Amino acid sequence: MRKVLFITSLNIILFSCVSQKNVVSSASPTPTTQKIVEKPKIEHHGTEDFYRVNIADSAKNNNTISYGSIVSAKPKKYKITKTYFPSLGQGFRQRFIILHYTALDNEKSIRVLTQQSVSSHYLVSDLDDHEIYQLVDENKRAYHAGISSWKNSNNLNDSSIGIEIVNTGYVVDSLGKRLFQAFPEHQIEKIAVLVKDISKRYMIPPTNILAHSDIAPTRKQDPGPLFPWKTLYEKHQIGMWYDEDKKQEFYPSALEDTTTLYEDASFIRKIQLTFKSFGYDIQITGMWDKQTKSVIEAFQYHFRPENYDGILDAETWSILQALAQKYK
């Protein structure tokens, strides 16, 4: 019995030594040069497009494969049947459309949005042609919104279609004011047709067609005050806009409020609560603090682009009330 125990112990010691030796002697992998491989082509079958290869980083949970139509499981030994398809209890992931500008030219926009950690579902160039670039499957999550919020929805990458628009953004003048670049008419026409198509297919309401600055007002300015939201609303029935008669109806009381109550904490809280109820992510502080100024500025970019100084004047207040009443 002792001999058996001795031999067993010896074997364990030898195994342990060999294991330790293997750990110590393991060599670091030799660096290799990565080869540039041409991307696989999109496959076309009838009217359907398919992309069957993942060229993204799987370790980061990224995947470029597009299955198209209905995606079904394929369990071994069992058949998936669609006898009772579809269930009524389902909805679209796509609940918002978020519009951005790239702050880059065409070439750089394509490179950044396809080769780095940011992306969008679509890219609209500033070229006067008949092409719109698709970069991400609509059923996939693109990385365009970042930390974001609108009403009760957060992290809008999960629930939105992102559209990037080629536009160089803004420069800052000697007084510190941002001067934005205009959008050519042919580019706006592309955007309008694209947004109309997406919003119709996914039944996205006007209240959920937003600027990046709307959902991230303390971080972002795009697509800026020169983006023609009013034109999109009046010409294409896209997005939100106020009714002029309602604005005029609210203006006298708004003028009195901003004249007599401007520094009153309860009035400031009322303003903040109205912005929050409308959709903006804002803390109720009762102060004209930095975050409140950023929210006002983002609102002005969208709905009062003639003056976007971040100060609540009578016109801004009357427009906010008209919108809050219209889209409550």
Model-flagged regions — what are they?
Residues V24, S28-P205:
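Active-site-adjacent loop/helix surface patches within enzyme catalytic domains
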Residues V18-K21:
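Bacterial signal peptide processing site
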Residues R2-T8:
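Sec-dependent signal peptide recognition
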Residues I204-R219:
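Acidic/histidine-rich, metal-coordinating catalytic segments
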Residues F85-P86, I110, S149-N152, L175-H186, ...:
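Second-shell loop/turn segments in exported
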Residues T259-R269, K276-L323:
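Short acidic, glycine/serine/threonine-rich helix-capping segments at coil-helix boundaries
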Residues I13-S16:
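C-terminal motif of bacterial Sec signal peptides marking the signal peptidase cleavage site
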Residues L123-V124, P225-P252:
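Acidic, His- and aromatic-enriched active-site or binding-groove loops in soluble protein domains
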